[in-house]
């Protein structure tokens, strides 16, 4: 069979910190530095450029522990569970 006929599945790497915890910690770090956390996170998720995330409290290195799709999965999951 042609490889293009199969759906590719993303698999989480699994780690010691959940995507939810990472997003919360990064959000707080951005707020503490006076940034708009939503705008900064959207900029990072859209571009992949870590410069959108402050290095304050190791937020930049923390958010890079996960792939952007894992962060998006968490955001979508959380949004849909609240509906």
Curated annotation (Swiss-Prot):
Lineage of origin: Bacteria, Bacillati, Bacillota, Clostridia, Eubacteriales
HAMAP family: UPF0297
Protein name: UPF0297 protein DSY2420
Family per similarity comment: Belongs to the UPF0297 family.
